[in-house]
Design a protein with these regions (language model features):
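Conserved Switch II/interswitch segment of TRAFAC-class P-loop GTPases
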Residues: 87-91, 95-101, 109-133, 138-162
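P-loop NTPase switch module centered on the Walker A-proximal segment
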Residues: 2-103, 112
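Conserved catalytic-core segments of large NTP-driven translation/proteostasis enzymes
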Residues: 7, 169-312, 316-319, 323, ...
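Residue-level signature of catalytic and energy-coupling elements of molecular machines
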Residues: 22, 28, 47, 94, ...
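C-terminal effector modules of nucleic-acid-centric enzymes and ribosome-associated factors
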Residues: 14-17, 155-157, 304-415
Length: 415
């Protein structure tokens, strides 16, 4: 059951849980936070994560107990009963592991400051999405990692050691080489204190500039009104995301780009939305000001029909006239992998061709682009849906192979 509670402070870092489907990512998040992050009705029915899930947790340290027993998510040490020192609050971004949901995982990587790669001990390593997720966060620039070897409760000692050796071999030559591998039973909350210690020692809070113009990626959006609510008592739409830089305050005027789709003179356009922040929520509580790091909910004056069912995912929020332009065309300095990732057999990546349709993840936005020109490594694409992005931003590139989008590389946006 959920033990959602107010945190002492706003979360200051986003940690993703990544890995193959059914390896226990959502169960691990629940073991740490007490919150089952897969709340969508279809997720509950099918038992897998479909949308990005979110949950927060505080981390405390007891001065009297030995590591790793000194770390917990409770203000009172569960081992000796002493009061713990509050270290920081953390937001978890629970990514789907199913191969068909790779684009959703990539959009989550845009807000991750670090990640936990969850690998189940009862299956051989690597599984296809274990390999694909690790490559994806490396392409997204996420460098700080911890590995959790899960499900040690359902294997014998021999298989647990075999699994450990498989993991060591798999991560050789990757950004995960040398990172801690923590054996865990998320189902029974075994070794969660060791996971918290590893997070503290390996995923620091990044330095951010609170004085820059604020920007926030939208990762979820909601209509919080119940059916039958009268027009007079309707609450405005809510957007959720992570502040990349700067800070927002209640009462701020904001702009949301690329905005909403409109039809004008027979053409489909996207127009930015302007609204006001009426409330801010972070760490399970209402706040007057929201800063960089962690996940934030913003209450607005928007018509809730715009925000319902994640209608504003992929937008960028900032102060009016201070956001990058909407781009219907992207010029990318592309960097392709030698082999596509995510298939059981490693398939060589061919060069991009004119007329080809590619899936692009830019920040939390997901769009399809048609290649209009290709010269050396410079690819120009016409987008089906514009993105709000600036020069130097990254775009993950996926190609359709055997009916599935497969990650084949990334590109840096050029003017």
């Amino acid at each position: 059951m959920s033990r959602l509670k107010k945190l002492p402070k706003q979360p200051e870092v986003n940690i993703g849980t990544i890995g193959h489907v059914d390896h226990g990512k959502t169960t691990l998040v629940e073991a740490i936070t007490g919150v089952w992050a897969a709340r969508h009705s279809e997720e509950l029915r099918r038992g897998i994560t479909i949308k990005l899930g979110y949950a927060d947790a505080p981390i405390y340290k007891c001065s009297k107990c030995e590591p790793h027993q000194s770390y917990s998510t409770e203000p009172t040490c569960p081992h000796c009963g002493s009061p713990g020192e509050f270290i920081r609050a953390v937001s978890f971004v629970d990514a789907p592991g199913h191969e068909a949901l790779m684009a959703t995982m990539l959009s989550g990587a845009a807000v991750m400051d670090g990640a936990i790669l969850v690998i189940a001990a009862d299956e051989s390593c690597p599984q296809p999405q274990t390999r694909e997720h690790l490559a994806a966060i490396e392409l997204a620039g996420v460098k700080n990692l911890v590995i959790v070897q899960n499900k040690i409760d359902i294997v014998d000692e021999k298989r647990a050691l075999e699994s450990y050796k498989e993991i060591i071999e798999f991560v050789k030559g990757t950004g995960a080489e040398g990172v801690p591998i923590i054996p865990v039973s998320a189902q029974h909350s075994v070794n969660i204190d060791a996971v918290l210690q590893a997070l503290e020692e390996n995923i620091p809070t990044p330095s951010r500039d609170p004085d820059k113009p604020p920007r926030m990626y939208v990762v979820r959006s909601f209509d919080v009104n119940k059916p039958g609510t009268s027009v007079e008592t309707l609450t405005g739409g809510v957007i959720g995301g992570s502040i990349l830089q700067g800070r927002f305050e209640a009462g701020d005027e904001i702009e949301i780009r690329p905005g909403v789709r409109v039809e004008k003179h027979g053409k489909t356009l996207y127009e930015p939305i302007f609204t006001e922040i009426v409330s801010l929520h972070a760490g399970g509580r209402k706040v007057k000001e929201a800063q960089c790091g962690g996940l934030v909910g913003i209450g607005t004056l928007l018509d809730p029909s715009l925000t319902k069912a994640d209608g504003l995912i992929g937008n960028l929020v900032g102060k009016p006239n201070m956001l990058p332009p909407n781009r219907s065309e992207l010029v990318l300095d592309s960097h392709l992998l030698e082999r596509a990732i995510g298939t059981k057999e490693l398939v060589q990546v061919d060069r991009v061709n004119k007329g080809e349709r590619l899936l692009l993840d830019v920040g939390t936005a997901i769009t399809v682009g048609s290649v209009v020109s290709m010269k050396n490594d410079i690819v120009t694409l016409q987008l089906a849906r514009p993105v709000c992005a600036e020069e130097g931003d990254r775009a993950a590139i996926s190609r359709k192979m055997a009916g599935r989008w497969r990650l084949i590389g990334y590109g840096i946006i050029k003017e």
